[in-house]
Curated annotation (Swiss-Prot):
PTM summary: Phosphorylated on serine and threonine residues in response to activation of receptor kinases. Phosphorylated on tyrosine residues by TEK/TIE2. Phosphorylated on tyrosine residues by PTK2/FAK1, and possibly also other kinases. Phosphorylation is enhanced by activation of receptor kinases by a cognate ligand. Tyrosine phosphorylation is essential for activation of down-stream protein kinases. Phosphorylation decreases affinity for target mRNA molecules.
Endpoints of the signal sequence: none
Protein's recorded name: Growth factor receptor-bound protein 7
Oligomeric form and interacting partners: Homodimer. Interacts (via SH2 domain) with EGFR, ERBB2, ERBB3 (when phosphorylated), ERBB4 (when phosphorylated), EPHB1, INSR, FGFR1, PDGFRA (tyrosine phosphorylated) and PDGFRB (tyrosine phosphorylated). Interacts (via SH2 domain) with TEK/TIE2 (tyrosine phosphorylated). Interacts with SHC1. Interacts with RND1. Interacts (when tyrosine phosphorylated) with FHL2 and HAX1. Interacts (via SH2 domain) with RET and PTK2/FAK1. Interacts (when not phosphorylated) with ELAVL1.
Region annotated Disordered, chain positions: 1-90
Domain PH positions: 229-338
Family in the record: Belongs to the GRB7/10/14 family.
Domain named SH2: residues: 431-527
Organism ancestry: Eukaryota, Metazoa, Chordata, Craniata, Vertebrata
Length: 532
């Protein structure tokens, strides 16, 4: 028995597979349909255009009630969506409008923090001035912001013109990075130091001196004024990528980047290996180099590319033999990257803090230790003391006069109360840090800049009744013991076995701010901490 199959199911024609528009399913074919034996030819089908479909959808949507879109940022264009956008500002890391407020959290050295609302383009100098006013601190050019990454043990002082919001935008999300508000006495020390102390002759390439006929001092002065960029060279210990071994190489810092020679001190391009780009990176100080990175010395620094957000991979680690070499390399990196802008920041700082309020020209030269002279005011007119022995004798006489004045002050009707008040007056001073360790005092001074004359006073851990004066000189921290002594019922303090005695620590500090005494330099800057 044969079963008859309908030609509709056996045909391979496209017309049989696709029903005509408007024909319901199950409708038999028309009477004028060709037989199965005839050759069927394809016919054009009506395909609705996209515009027609959009119009039909609009008509259907207008007939339905409007439902609010719960995710408008997903439906907005990529240039306006904070999720679909490609830039950092579009991803929500920074507000798109520079005039919009931006909240930053700033920490102090004692661990306290404070949230400050500033404009998105606020610079580090503007934020510092705001924090100085709110903390009622003494305004000077030494305040600064420091970018800290505790996980990586990296620190970097922000320049005055840098935007704080842009710096925070490059941080990893959910990390422990922070901004710290503290003193930075070494920020512009490169413009105050002599050329030989900043960059020794062995660190500056001699080819530029021979080509221009300029002296070493002129080359460094042009370098500081961003007039020229000499080649900085010297030995550095660096660690290879993914390796734990440190090797000593001769490195060159140029405008094009940092290089090291694979063959001694050769400058042949065949022997130079590219390390990092200065303009696309930031240089940081490594605080725990031995513990975290296995550095052979404590004087390490790191070059971190701007595109690197987190992790140790991609960091270029270096270390020097001493603190002076590290300071020279850090200063060279800053000058190569920021150039004339760094010098402008320094000039603006001088105009802000040295010009008188009524206006006028700044002083022709800054007051330093070299411009201070000993004076004799015993007669009717002042006289400059040129003899060093006579100057030392005048300093000792001044110390004796201070002691007599203090003895007269203490000879009041209540000497016991006056003595106790004089003995505890140092606790109200910003340079007194209480009972901190020797290592902590060195860390505080190192963080605020290893400049000559930076000091603090702390309680001695070995001698319960004594104190210690920690002083920075030639980028090294030295400690001087202050011992108390009692004579005729009165308490005195001395650092030279009683040769020069003071009734309290405040008198001792004020005396050595004007006279060196047994110290290698004057007490110029006090290491202080401010709570926000």
């Amino acid at each position: 028995m044969e079963l008859g199959l309908s030609p509709l199911h056996l045909s391979s024609s496209p017309e049989d597979l696709y029903l005509a528009s408007g024909t319901p399913p199950g409708t038999p074919p028309p009477l004028d349909a060709p037989l199965s034996g005839e050759v069927k030819r394809s016919q054009p089908l009506p395909i609705p255009t996209s515009r027609k479909l959009l119009r039909e959808e609009e008509l259907q949507s207008t007939s339905l009630p409007s439902i609010p879109n719960p995710f408008p940022e997903l439906c907005s264009p990529s240039s306006q969506s904070p999720i679909l956008g490609g830039s950092s500002s579009a991803r929500g890391l920074l507000p798109r409008d520079t005039s919009c407020p931006h909240v930053i959290k700033v920490y102090s050295e004692d661990g306290t923090c404070r949230s400050v609302e500033v404009a998105t383009g606020a610079t580090a100098r503007y934020v510092c001035e705001m924090l100085v006013q709110r903390s009622h601190a003494l305004s000077d050019e030494n305040w600064g912001l420091v970018e800290c990454h505790p996980y990586l043990a990296l620190e970097r002082a922000l320049e005055d013109h840098e935007s704080v919001a842009e710096v925070q935008a490059a941080w990893p999300i959910g990390g422990d990075s922070r901004i710290v508000f503290r003193k930075n006495f070494a920020k512009y020390e490169l413009f105050k130091s002599t050329p030989h102390s900043l960059f020794p002759e062995k660190m500056v390439s001699s080819c530029l001196d021979a080509h221009t006929g300029m002296s070493h001092e002129d080359v460094i002065q042009n370098f500081l004024n961003a007039g020229s960029f000499p080649e900085i060279q010297g030995f550095l210990q660096l660690r290879g990528s993914g390796r734990k071994l440190w090797k000593r190489f001769f490195c060159f810092l140029r405008r094009s980047g940092l290089y090291y020679s694979t063959k001694g001190t050769s400058k042949d391009p065949r022997h130079l290996q590219y390390v990092a780009d200065v303009n696309e990176s930031n240089v940081y100080v490594v605080t725990q180099g031995r513990k975290l990175y296995g550095m052979p010395t404590d004087f390490g620094f790191c070059i971190k590319p701007n595109k690197l957000r987190n992790g140790h991979k991609g960091l270029r680690l270096f270390c020097t033999e001493d603190e002076r070499s590290r300071s020279c390399w850090l200063a060279a990196f800053r000058l190569f990257k920021f150039g004339v802008q760094l010098y402008k920041n320094y000039q603006q700082t001088l105009c802000r803090h040295m010009c008188p309020p009524c206006g006028g020209s700044p002083p022709s030269r800054s007051v330093s230790d070299d411009t201070l002279v000993a004076m004799d005011f015993s007669g009717h007119a002042g006289r400059v003391i040129e003899n060093p022995r006579e100057a030392l004798s005048a300093a000792l006489e001044e110390a004796q006069a201070w002691r007599k004045k203090t003895n007269h002050r203490l000879s009041l009707p209540t000497p016991s109360s006056g003595t106790s008040l004089s003995a505890a007056i140092h606790r109200t001073q910003p340079w007194f840090h209480g009972r901190i360790s020797r290592e902590e005092s060195q860390r505080l001074i190192r963080q605020q800049g290893l400049v000559d004359g930076l000091f603090l006073v702390r309680e001695s851990q070995r001698n319960p009744q004594g104190f210690v004066l920690s002083l920075c000189h030639v980028q090294k921290v030295k400690h001087y013991l202050i011992l108390p002594s009692e004579e005729e019922g009165r308490l005195y303090f001395s650092m030279d076995d009683g040769l020069t005695r003071f009734t309290d620590l405040l008198q001792l500090v004020e005396f050595h701010q004007l006279n060196r005494g047994i110290l290698p330099c004057l007490l110029r800057y006090c290491c202080t901490r401010v709570a926000l």
